[in-house]
């Protein structure tokens, strides 16, 4: 019996020894990569049959509780379309606490792979749904809200990721969120933690090129997502053309379901640090601005929901000099434009007009054309400019604006627009536009006009055809510089433009000019002007309108022009109660009249007055008339200054006559040494091409200094080479 027990004991010992050896061999065999690969291939072959889809793993290396290393992982969907093709996957494990619903991973590396995600055109089903269906539990599982995953490091290198919703059409330009393709995708992230629906991570590097052409050089940020929303901190986004810093971007929610109603429920709380943004990068996400490719520099705070988004303390720079500081409240763009409410404020701005003209606009949009007359402003410096209301009823005000033309301020005005046109008027019944040191002459290219200071109010309407109507225009001009004189206290009243007719009143109460006038001007191409002026007093020398000293003028003037064009026009002027005083002499005329007629090259001018009558008729060639006459008079009187020997003849061919009436006071003022009897007559003709000037003089009496002549009869004809007469 003892022997039997010894034999049995020995046999059991030998069996245990071999069993231990077998266990040791088995353990080492399982840890061998080729064994693990063989097992994996058998498992994937079985899985392929179960899924009716190709699943392959090229090589496996697993160390229990240490790491999992997979190579050449490939998965197809049942339609034989690739879902995953991965060259290398490495998973470094740290702790796996099944009972505590916690998984801690040291490292996850994905290298050289392609991931294809699609949604079916028929029902929107994802192409990986067959995997979810196979591995899902038959009965509802316990909530995973307490499951926690910690991943110390995630690296993705040289990856390709695509997403296509086959139910949606593809956009021709820009990032299409229904058809995404990320090439050369590289990602490095640390401190990744998920618990339930929450996620936190530190993005160290994110790079890719999207199929649209948008290229991301790098993105760094601290990110978190939960039921309370999405939060990015200390984000830095870089593209080849843009560098954007976002210290804070929070999309706040009460529930993750709020993202399904993004415009109304998700609240923005963001700060954009001073950043360089290339508009071409923005165009990939807003195709409407495609073609805009310049850099802008901006910073600011973004608040509230998208339906009432506020951009506070916005700083915007573009071009060489333009800078804008503003507070903006964007409207709800989902509403019809008539119900979109604007409330915008430019606190400070320097706008360079050349920067505006050089701005690249979206494709198909004409470049900004700055009107020639406005280009003279060069720039605008604005302070506290405000705009509020709807597109059809806007209120605009500008506390202060300065340009190369001068300064202006604009009290609140109302701009109403409808299908029939636009109407602009002041909110209050008072002047709303003030101009200071305004270079009116520079604006109008009239060098004789200088600065203007004044205040204006008006109501302006522009209909759909571009017709302009001005109502109730009034202005109080503190000063207007004209012809080297600064006129003060000018008033414009009851001015209007209607049916292309301008009607208005002008009143001047300057120390050297007191007058009132009524104007009626046709703004069309055909001249039609009517002007009535009552000049109570005008100190002409002080106004730089006369070289004499202390001369004064007064009259009631009626002036008009009428005709289909300036080449066929009739004009008249009447001066009643004309008084002109210089030194101790005065001229008075109860009525003086001038009639003017022009038809093509033919002109006729008639002047009649108690002082003298004058008539000229024919082809005048006004632009060269003076030089023409001086040339011919120099033949008879060579000392005439300005005469030239070489001369090009004009078309001038006219007759003229002058008859004196009561000229004594006129001569006392301008030629005090000359006396000319009444009924003195000067008449003649001039033909430039024939080089012929005829002058005839009939004078009862003429006295000059100590000389005195009576019964004078004089006739002279001047040719190009001689003069004769009697």
Predicted segments with their positions:
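N-terminal type II signal-anchor transmembrane helix
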Residues: 1-51
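Flexible beta-edge/linker motif
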Residues: 32, 58-125, 133-166, 181-204, ...
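Hydrophobic residues on conserved beta-strands that form the core of alpha/beta folds
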Residues: 57, 70, 86, 105, ...
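Amphipathic hydrophobic-ligand
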Residues: 79-93, 168-187, 211-222, 228-229, ...
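Gram-negative outer-membrane beta-barrel proteins
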Residues: 114-118, 162-167, 209, 276-280, ...
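Tryptophan-anchored aromatic micro-motifs
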Residues: 151-159, 474, 535, 575, ...
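Transmembrane beta-strand segments that form the barrel wall of outer-membrane beta-barrel proteins
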Residues: 203-206, 230-236, 308-316, 393-401, ...
